[in-house]
């Protein structure tokens, strides 16, 4: 992303959440603020009837729908697990690379004692906070923590906040690892493992090697790679599940669950009339710290 502006891919993800909420029956993930969170350009597209009809046509639901499924599926999964974690006395929630997620307006009222930390690039945060304040009152339980993932660790960033290290925490890290070098992703997970309390949980999505994909999945992944390259946010990070598992287990994490695209589709998109499903190009990983 360019200095002084918010992430273009975060804007695109918000647009996909907005379209899914506004233009599908029985949305997998409901984000009534997503439309206002995205850019003027995306708002114009989502307000053009012909574009909306095309975006939600059967042929695009089978292609673009893979990307929509990825975006809304990961958010639904993370918040389902967060809800379970809070019931088991998790008291802190860290959104790593929070993007334009609207949790603080959508759901924070349901978790009045949950301390929320949004960690992201300062330019994305500045644009986001401006939009959030126009849409509603921010709860006192949220704190915005700036970070440059390539230059500092998450522990260094959270050390500047009210984050309590001895308190078990739920970390949600969505839509970010794809744009980071694999070493940066692993260093961030290692940093979490070193400073987070035992019992803390992490949910993240990650890309697999698109060279191993076939048909529309492979073409779609190549198309997304070209699109993000044009946005100046190229895809950099891919992992083999077995290699990633081995790396995080050495850090002290237990792999609770690693869902393939097919498993996510089975859980959240089964038998949908609109044929939206989750891509096979990315997976969802649930970790628990057990040092």
Descriptions of predicted regions:
Residues 154-165:
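Short amphipathic alpha-helix with an adjacent loop that forms part of the alpha/beta core around
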Residues 189, 194-211:
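Conserved beta-strand signature within the Rossmann-like core of class I S-adenosyl-L-methionine
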Residues 163-184:
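A short SAM/SAH-binding and catalytic strip from SAM-dependent methyltransferases
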Residues 1-94, 100-145, 153:
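Rossmann-like AdoMet
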Residues 217-234:
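Short, glycine-/aromatic-enriched active-site segment of Class I SAM-dependent methyltransferases
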Residues 267-291:
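Core SAM-dependent methyltransferase catalytic element
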Residues 235-261:
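Short alpha-helix
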Residues 142-144, 153-156, 179-197:
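A short, conserved alpha-helix within the catalytic core of class I
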């Amino acid at each position: 992303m360019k200095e002084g502006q918010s992430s273009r891919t975060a804007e695109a993800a918000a647009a996909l959440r907005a379209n899914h909420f506004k233009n599908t029956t029985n949305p997998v993930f409901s984000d009534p603020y997503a439309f206002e969170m995205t850019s003027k350009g995306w708002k114009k597209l989502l307000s053009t009837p012909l574009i909306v009809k095309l975006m939600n046509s059967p042929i695009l639901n089978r292609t673009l729908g893979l990307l929509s499924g990825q975006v809304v599926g990961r958010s639904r999964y993370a918040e389902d697990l967060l809800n379970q974690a809070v019931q088991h006395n998790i008291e802190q929630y860290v959104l790593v690379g929070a993007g334009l997620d609207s949790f603080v307006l959508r759901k924070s009222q349901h978790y009045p004692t949950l301390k929320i930390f949004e960690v992201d690039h300062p330019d994305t945060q500045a644009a986001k906070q401006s939009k959030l304040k126009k849409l509603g009152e921010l709860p006192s339980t949220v704190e915005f923590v700036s970070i440059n993932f390539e230059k500092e660790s998450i522990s260094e960033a959270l050390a500047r906040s009210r984050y309590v290290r001895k308190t078990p925490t739920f970390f949600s890290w969505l839509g970010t690892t794809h744009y980071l070098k694999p070493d940066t992703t692993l260093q961030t997970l290692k940093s979490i493992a070193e400073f987070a309390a035992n019992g803390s949980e992490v949910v993240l999505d990650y890309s697999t090697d698109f060279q191993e994909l076939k048909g529309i999945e492979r073409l779609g992944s190549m198309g997304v790679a070209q699109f993000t390259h044009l946005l100046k946010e190229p895809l950099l990070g891919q992992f083999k599940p077995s290699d990633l598992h081995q790396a995080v287990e050495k850090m002290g994490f237990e792999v609770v669950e690693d869902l393939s695209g097919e498993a996510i589709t089975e859980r959240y998109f089964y038998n949908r009339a609109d044929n939206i499903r989750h891509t096979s190009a990315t997976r969802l990983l649930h970790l628990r710290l057990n040092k």
